[in-house]
């Protein structure tokens, strides 16, 4: 019985490992046709990475669960024959003190508490001094009125260009 089973398995392994041409092509040719594309390789790589990441998360979650559920060992369960390590002092363990709030840093040791400043409501903007623009216009007029005196001497015929006319309009002035 065992001998017959071994014979069947050996024939099966031989047939599977022997390359038989299929449809006139060799098995190596079929292997080339079945090559995966780069995108398929990337997909399989990403899938493997995500599975590995999931396994790592489960492992870490299980590990953290063991840490959090581990029993807290009391320090009083020390064996009676053990000696404390040399150069160490037995101080009581204190996690907080009663006078902790008394000695704070300089910034937080203020008597007054912080008060929020009220937000400014948006209002009208302040305007400049009233009449300042008028003063500037008066100065310009003064300088303009001083120009015709130079025209009388023959230096300038037209002191100011007329901005109301465009260059396409015919000249209405007679010279």
Swiss-Prot record:
Molecular function via GO: hormone activity; peptide hormone receptor binding
Record's protein name: Parathyroid hormone-related protein
Biased composition, class Polar residues, residue ranges: 76-90
Cellular component annotations (GO), alphabetically ordered: cytoplasm; extracellular space; nucleus
InterPro entries reported for this sequence: PTH-rel, PTH/PTH-rel
UniProt motif (Nuclear localization signal) ranges: 108-129
One GO BP: nipple sheath formation
Compositional bias of kind Basic residues: 122-132
Organism: Mus musculus
Gene inactivation effect: Lethality at birth, probably from asphyxia. Mice show widespread abnormalities of endochondral bone development: bones are shorter, wider, deformed and undergo premature mineralization.
